[in-house]
Amino acid sequence: YDGPGLLREFPQVTGIMVGEGEVTFREVLEQYLREAETAGQSEQQPESDSTEHQVADRRGTVAGKSVVERFGQIPGLCLASGYTAPRDLTDLTTLPFLYENMEPFTNRIIYYETSRGCPYRCSYCLSSIDKKVRLRDISVVKRELQFFLDQNVKQVKFIDRTFNCDHKHAMEIWRYF
C-alpha cells in the first residue's frame, strides 16, 4: 500500500503502522497515555472535547510537539514526514495470551496462531515477504491449548498461514490433541 499517499488523502490520520503491529500499537498507545498524563498536569491544556484541541490534534501538534517528536522514535510507523525505522519481527512466544478471561468469548470461535510467515515465494502473496516461518514455542502452544480444553472451548480456528509447513511443529500439536 502507499502509506504516504493515504496520509495525504486522509490528513486527519496521524500515522499508519507498517508490518506487524502488536509492539508498535502498544508503543503508540503508551505515547498517547504519556501525553494524556502530561495534559492532565497542565492547566493550559484545552478541554479534550474542545474544537481547538481537535484541530491541534489533526495538525499533529500536541503540547507544542510535532508528530515526529511524538512518534518518530517508534519503529514500524509511516508518518507524513516519512517512515520510522523498520520494526524487527516479533518473537511469537513473547506475545500475550489473549484468552485468559474467557467470558467475552463464550460460544464464539477462538482464533489462535502458532506460526507466522511462509517459506514459499508466490508473487501474488504478502505472506512470503520475508520467506521464513516463525513458530510459537511448542511448550507455550500446548499450555494454551490445554487452557482451551480445560475451558471446554467448542471451536479453535488456527489462523496460521501455513500451519503444516513445519511438519514437526504441526504433528506435535496434533499428537497433543
Spans of model-derived segments:
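Glycine-rich beta-alpha loop elements in corrinoid/cobalamin-binding modules
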Residues: 1-53, 57-86
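Radical SAM [4Fe-4S] cluster-binding motif and immediate context
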Residues: 63, 96-177
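N-terminal [4Fe-4S]-dependent radical SAM core
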Residues: 71-114
